[in-house]
Amino acid sequence: MAHKKAGGSTRNGRDSESKRLGVKRFGGESVLAGNIIVRQRGTKFHAGVNVGIGRDHTLFALTDGKVKFEVKGPKNRKFISIEG
């Protein structure tokens, strides 16, 4: 009789759920106050004019207007602002 030994249990086969990070509203898009602009880990993008920052570094609009991305400062940081 042909026999095959039972396979051992594997220690792989797990992965974490994706966190859906990234830019949610792009440059030139209209936003309403409270709209999320970017979900991020750390400050990859910094809050500019009329943009608030949540405790998980989420950037959101404080006023209605259009999204503007800009690079400024001595460290060439990326800022996101809302233009009324």
UniProtKB/Swiss-Prot annotation:
Disulphides: none
Q: Where is this region: Disordered?
A: 1-22
The keyword Ribonucleoprotein belongs to this UniProt entry's keyword annotation? yes
Q: Which UniProt keywords apply?
A: Ribonucleoprotein, Ribosomal protein
Spell out the family assignment given in the record's similarity comment.
Belongs to the bacterial ribosomal protein bL27 family.
User: Which PANTHER family does the record match to this protein?
Assistant: LARGE RIBOSOMAL SUBUNIT PROTEIN BL27M, RIBOSOMAL PROTEIN L27
Quote the protein name from its UniProt record. Large ribosomal subunit protein bL27
